[in-house]
Amino acid sequence: MSYYDTIFSKHIDKIKSEGRYREFKALKRQADNFPFAEHANKQIVMWCINDYLGMSKHAKVMQASIDALLKYGVGSGGTRNIGGNNIAILELEKELADLHKKQAALVFTSGFVANDTTLASLAKIMPDIVFFSDELNHASIIAGVTSSRAEKYIYRHLDVKHLEELLQSVDINRPKIIVFESAYSMDGFFSPIKDIINLAKKYNALTFIDEVHTVGLYGKHGGGIAELLNCSDQIDIIQGTLAKAYGTIGGYITSNHNLVDAIRLTAPGFIFTTSLPPVISTAATHSIRHLKESNEERIKHQEVVTKLKNSFENFNIPYLKNESHIVPIIIGDPIKAASASNMLLNKYGIYVQHINFPTVPRGTERLRIIPTPAHTDKMINDLSIALVHIFAELDIELSSTKELNEEIRLNLIA
C-alpha cells in the first residue's frame, strides 16, 4: 500500500502547492434562524449557500417532509423499475412537467446525474448526433458530452456568431443538439436564449437548456429564464435541480413524452440507481407548488440582490457585473482568495467560500456571494465593510466594476 500511498500523497501535495487544497467547513445550519449557522461553536452568517430562497426551512416544505416520513418511512426501497416507483415521485414529475409546460418529466438523484446521463444517452439513441456546447458549460454537461463519444463542437462563451459558424459546418439533416445554461454559475451571465432558439430552428437542431440556477427564482411561476422570456415551449429539453431554489435534492429533465420515455428506458444514471425517497419528493413538490403561487420570495430576493450590488458599488468592491443574482468578486490569486475566505469566517463571522481551479479558470479565482431574501441591510453592510478591510490587509486592489468586468470578461472567453 505504501507505493500507492506515495502516489496519492504526491497528488495531494501538488494541489496544496498550487493553493488549491480544499478544506470543508463543518457547519450546523439552523432551520429556525436562516441564514445563520454554527461553526466552531460560533454563530456565523452564510453568504454562499445555494438554498437561494431558504425553502429548505419553509414551514410548508418541512411539514410535508415530516408527514411523508411518518407515512412512507426514510428510504424509497429500490430503483424506479424495482420497488422504488413511489407515488410521491410520480406526483413530483407531474408537477415539474406542469411547471415548464411540457408533456413529461423525469427525476434523477442529482442535477449532475440528470445532465450527464441524459446527454450521453441521447448519443445512444441517435448515434450520429453532433453536440454544440458552450465552452463554460458545467462539468456535468462536459461529462455527458465527453462520455457520449459523439462528435462535438465547443463554441465560445455566449458567442452566437461562433455557434452559427459551427452549425453551418454540419449537414442540416444530421441530428444535432445545442447545450447551454440559462445562467452561468461562476460569472452570473445569462445566455442569449432567444438567439440560440432561432439558430436551432434555422439549422434543425434540438435545444437543451440547464436552468439549475434559475428555476424557482425567475418567471411568474418560477419556471426559470425560459418562462421569464416566454419561450419554454420553444426549448426541447429543460433541465433543472431541486437542490437550489427548491431547497431539497435531486435533478430532472422535462420534454415531450417520447423523448422523456426514451431517456427513461436508456439512461444508466436513471435505471441503475435507487430513486429519491418519498420524504424528499414530497418536500420538493410542496416547494415547487408554493413558488408557483407565491412571488413574495422572488421579489424579496431581487431586492436584496440589488441592495448588495449597490453596496459593493458604493464601497468600490470589484464584483463582476451581471444581470443575475450571482455576485462574483474576482481575486485572481488562489492563496489570496483562500485567505480572504478564511479571514471573513474567522475574524468577521461571515462564511463565503472561495472558488479556485478547476471550478474556475486559473487567474480568475474568486469569492462568490449568494444573497437570499433573509439577508438584512446590516448583514450587507457588515459584509461590505469586512471586504474593504480584508482587501486592504491582503493588498487586493479596489477597482470599479466596469473596469474589472471588461478585464475579466476577456479572460473568461479567451
UniProtKB/Swiss-Prot annotation:
The modification N6-(pyridoxal phosphate)lysine is found at K244. The keyword Acyltransferase applies. Pyridoxal 5'-phosphate binds at S185, H213, T241, T273, T274. Pathway: Porphyrin-containing compound metabolism; protoporphyrin-IX biosynthesis; 5-aminolevulinate from glycine: step 1/1. Pfam families: Aminotran_1_2. InterPro entries: 4pyrrol_synth_NH2levulA_synth, Aminotrans_II_pyridoxalP_BS, Aminotransferase_I/II_large, AON_synthase_class-II, PyrdxlP-dep_Trfase, PyrdxlP-dep_Trfase_major, PyrdxlP-dep_Trfase_small. Substrate binds at R22, S133, K152, T359. SUPFAM superfamilies: PLP-dependent transferases. Its cofactor is pyridoxal 5'-phosphate. Keywords: Acyltransferase, Heme biosynthesis, Pyridoxal phosphate, Transferase. CDD domains: KBL_like (cd06454). Its EC number is 2.3.1.37. One of its GO terms (biological process) is protoporphyrinogen IX biosynthetic process. One of its GO terms (molecular function) is 5-aminolevulinate synthase activity. The active site is at K244. It catalyses: succinyl-CoA + glycine + H(+) = 5-aminolevulinate + CO2 + CoA. Homodimer. Belongs to the class-II pyridoxal-phosphate-dependent aminotransferase family. PANTHER family: 2-AMINO-3-KETOBUTYRATE COENZYME A LIGASE, MITOCHONDRIAL, CLASS II AMINOTRANSFERASE/8-AMINO-7-OXONONANOATE SYNTHASE. This is 5-aminolevulinate synthase. It comes from Rickettsia felis (strain ATCC VR-1525 / URRWXCal2) (Rickettsia azadi).
